[in-house]
Amino acid sequence: MSKIDIQDNFLNPNYFKNLKNLFLSERVNWTYSDVISYENELSATKIDNFQFTHMVYFDDAPVSPHYNDLIDFINEIKVASTCKIKVNMNPKTDKIIVHGFHNDMVYKCKTGILYLNNNNGYTIFEDGTKVESIENRFVSFDSGMKHSGTSCTDQRVRLVININYFEPELHK
């Protein structure tokens, strides 16, 4: 099994609070996304398979006015090159919905998730490993590991920042 790295209290508390407040504010425009998992077999029914997204970085360029707000986050990860940054907002549901296992990227890189709020949703991996949604927790793993996000039932939304990136090469 590939390694899943979990780091709690990942960002400076004041910076994290500002980031969380930004993405919970009306200053951010959200896009409705009809499909969460790109696999043919979904755990969620079609009616439950949606989320709201805010693309921050895509196709080798910032695509959001909020990209600069994430610079300290990117630097904390020690990113050599960014592939994609997207903020996902999953609305509350009556029961936890597992949206379907997927890989974010088709090539080998790292996937990272920063949890912006506490809720009873989670990230689950194909091997059954669950990572709870705890605010200011950062989880990273090889992009080849299939995973799924969920909805939550105890908060209005489940909010995460998803980043796909290349790590710097280690020099001896």
What are these regions (language model features)?
Residues M1, R27, I124, I163-K172:
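Double-stranded beta-helix
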Residues M1-A80:
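Non-heme Fe(II)/2-oxoglutarate
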Residues Y67-D72, K78-N103, Y107-T111:
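Internal catalytic-core helix/loop-beta-alpha segment
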Residues K95-G100, Y107-C109, Y115-I134:
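A short beta-strand-loop-beta hairpin characteristic of the jelly-roll/cupin
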Residues G100-F101, K146-D154:
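Short beta-strand His + acidic residue motifs that chelate non-heme Fe in jelly-roll/DSBH
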Residues G112-L114, Q155-H171:
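A short hydrophobic beta-strand segment most commonly corresponding to one strand
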Residues V131-S148:
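Conserved metal-binding segment of the jelly-roll/cupin
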